[in-house]
């Protein structure tokens, strides 16, 4: 397995080499647009709650001046004080407190719904867009890094939406209202407070600048670690076969240590912000208390004891949101780092499809003309609309032709050169050649997982670029090199080939693939649950199910990519008999690894470095004693 330094990290679009969050204002606007699109009335109600809560807190602080100057101080000078006015005043301020508490509770309650709904919508959009991405995207990005976008990056938005942004809005409203209240009480003490606030903001800015870059690095390292864990989980058998457990652990420790270091740096700076701001706030409080006491004693500016008490309460209310703004800034920066990765994935171009020819159910009318029908007839036709408004129908036969096809996964490196081949209806074409010769690449071009750079591929005489990709792929039965089964019953996995297939059709497909006998021996037969990509089945059984899944689709063209390369000889015989029945009457392209697959092929295509160097039947190629003869008497004969 690869060492840690060889593990693929996220590239530029997954938060790779970006030194900082680009366009944070644009990202924040995009997030809020997503929120407002679905929850604008809720956000307005939240804003009302925040305003009410902030004003209630300010009013409660201002009440202290009235309490001290109009009630407490006069009552200390009375021999028989009347507590009724004081009780009434306390009742009024108590009501204000209750209103503030209810408003804060309403704000929190509504924001939970808004946040979870927004995250649900984002995850849905992410998954919907992911389904539209081309195969090459998944070939170029580690799956663990993609998973990190769904989990970690989306979760960073949760705290920002539910806490940080409401807290920032609340802090802004509180700061403005408290500032004007302090100015009304004492402009001199307000100046003292603002000087301390300026120092607090300067320190917060410096801390935020340092922590921000490390939060981005933390998200990047987390994506790398997730990708490595997924790679090790998928390759666990290989790790154990080669006894590389320690090597895998060393790679994990290296990436885990990188994550720990970046997280330490990010959180070390972030965590000192609160104590620094708290101490500066305490200093501000003490300075204002001393200055206010001196002003009250000297009577400067009409300062009273009530003025000082109320101002100190406002000072606390002013410093707290300033400190909260600084703290929440880190959360916002971390969330924006995640949002950048989310939106870059969502902005990845979808798979293009310029096709207009579709696949439809067809039948012959009384005049023996092919016409479209809504019922499933077992007869398929290509529906070809023309510029003059007319529509023609061509029977789907399974005739596939390559003409002078060139292709490269990257433009500067061509891997297929001048490919010319054809598969007539019912023919079996086998591809042989050494690893990297281009066998799998050809099959990827037939189903348009990738598009050619030059030449033409025709399907029943139609350029496949004119055929809608969904319809093209619906006409193909594919058994991939890596068999993948989904969580669900055996029946559901077979039905995945055609979702409207009946149980009887699924069972018939399993019989055709020679899978019926082993399925019946499972604990619950066709209702046996499969989990973990069919981990409770053998490799051969998994491939038999994959073949049954292709069979239930009843396609005119089959693509078998190394379908029998990793099963034992006895199981291969079962699969081969099933495949012979499945391939009868269908055009079949087979990447061959077994002698039995090659010998009965109508045409054998020998590939070398992306070029066809030989073609013909088994006997013809053996007689030539060329590359195929070497493979036959060497590698293929050994298999």
Question: What is each of the regions a protein language model found here?
Answer:
Residues 1-57, 72-93, 107-111, 115, ...:
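Membrane-integrated ABC transporters
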Residues 51-59, 94-105, 157-160, 164-176, ...:
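Hydrophobic alpha-helical transmembrane bundles that constitute the permease/transmembrane domains
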Residues 74, 181-195, 265, 269-340, ...:
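Helix-loop-helix
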Residues 37-40, 135-136, 154-161, 165, ...:
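An intracellular "coupling" helix at the cytosolic face of ABC transporter transmembrane type-1 domains
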Residues 38, 42-55, 96, 102, ...:
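Transmembrane helices of ABC transporter permease
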Residues 79, 362-639:
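ABC-type nucleotide-binding domain
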Residues 17-25, 48-49, 56-72, 96-143, ...:
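Juxtamembrane helix-loop junctions of ABC transporter transmembrane domains
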Residues 12-19, 116, 124-148, 152-154, ...:
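Short intracellular "coupling" helices and adjacent cytoplasmic loop segments at the cytosolic face
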């Amino acid at each position: 397995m690869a060492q840690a330094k060889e593990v693929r990290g996220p590239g530029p679009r997954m938060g790779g080499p970006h030194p900082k969050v680009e366009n944070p204002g644009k990202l924040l606007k995009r997030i809020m647009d997503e929120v407002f699109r679905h929850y604008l009335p809720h956000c307005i109600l939240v804003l009302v709650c925040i305003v009410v809560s902030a004003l209630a807190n300010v009013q409660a602080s201002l009440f202290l001046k009235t309490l001290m100057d109009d009630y407490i101080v006069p009552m200390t000078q009375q021999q028989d004080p009347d507590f009724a006015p004081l009780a009434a005043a306390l009742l009024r301020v108590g009501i204000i407190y209750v209103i503030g508490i209810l408003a804060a509770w309403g704000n929190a309650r509504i924001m939970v719904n808004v946040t979870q709904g927004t995250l649900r919508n984002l995850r849905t959009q992410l998954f919907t867009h992911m389904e539209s991405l081309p195969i090459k995207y998944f070939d170029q990005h580690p799956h663990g890094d993609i998973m990190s976008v769904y989990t970690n990056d989306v979760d960073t938005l949760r705290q920002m939406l539910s806490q940080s942004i409401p807290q920032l809005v609340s802090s802004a409203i509180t700061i403005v209202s408290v500032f004007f209240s302090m100015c009304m009480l004492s402009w001199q003490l307000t100046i003292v407070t603002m000087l301390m606030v300026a120092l607090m903001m300067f320190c917060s800015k410096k801390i935020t600048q340092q922590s921000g870059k490390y939060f981005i690095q933390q998200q990047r390292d987390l994506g790398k670690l997730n990708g490595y864990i997924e790679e090790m989980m998928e390759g666990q058998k290989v790790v154990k076969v080669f006894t590389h457990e320690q090597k895998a652990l060393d790679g994990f420790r290296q990436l885990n240590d990188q994550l720990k270091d970046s997280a330490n740096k990010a959180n070390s700076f972030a965590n000192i912000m609160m104590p620094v701001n708290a101490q500066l706030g305490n200093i501000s409080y003490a300075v204002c208390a001393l200055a206010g006491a001196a002003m009250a004693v000297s009577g400067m500016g009409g300062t009273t004891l009530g003025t000082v008490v109320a101002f100190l309460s406002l000072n606390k209310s002013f410093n707290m949101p300033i400190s909260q703004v600084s703290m929440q800034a880190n959360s916002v920066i971390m969330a924006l780092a995640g949002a950048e990765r989310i939106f870059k994935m969502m902005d990845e171009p979808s798979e293009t499809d310029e096709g207009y020819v579709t696949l439809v159910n067809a039948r012959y009318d009384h005049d023996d003309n092919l016409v479209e029908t809504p019922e499933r007839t077992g007869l398929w036709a290509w529906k070809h609309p023309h510029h003059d408004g007319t529509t023609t129908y061509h029977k789907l036969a399974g005739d596939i032709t390559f003409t002078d096809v060139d292709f490269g996964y990257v433009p500067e490196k061509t891997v297929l050169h001048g490919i010319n081949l054809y598969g007539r209806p019912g023919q079996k074409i086998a591809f042989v050649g050494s690893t990297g010769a281009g066998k799998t690449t050809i099959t990827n071009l037939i189903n348009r997982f990738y598009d050619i750079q030059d030449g033409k591929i025709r399907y029943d005489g139609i350029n496949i670029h004119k055929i809608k990709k969904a319809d093209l792929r619906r006409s193909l039965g594919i058994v991939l090199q890596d068999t993948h089964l989904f969580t669900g019953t055996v029946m559901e996995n077979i039905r995945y080939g055609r979702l409207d297939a009946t149980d009887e059709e699924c069972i018939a497909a399993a019989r055709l693939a020679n899978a019926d006998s082993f399925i019946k021996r499972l604990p619950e037969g066709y209702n046996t649950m499969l989990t973990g990509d069919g981990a409770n089945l053998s490799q051969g059984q998994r491939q038999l199910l994959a073949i049954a899944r292709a069979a239930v689709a009843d396609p005119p063209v089959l693509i078998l990519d190394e379908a029998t390369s990793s099963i034992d000889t006895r199981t291969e015989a079962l699969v081969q008999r099933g495949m012979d029945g499945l391939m009868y009457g269908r055009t079949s392209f087979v990447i061959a690894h077994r002698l039995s697959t090659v010998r009965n092929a109508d045409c054998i295509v020998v590939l070398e470095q992306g070029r066809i160097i030989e073609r013909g039947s088994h006997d013809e190629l053996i007689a030539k004693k060329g590359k195929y003869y070497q493979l036959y008497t060497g590698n293929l004969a050994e298999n």
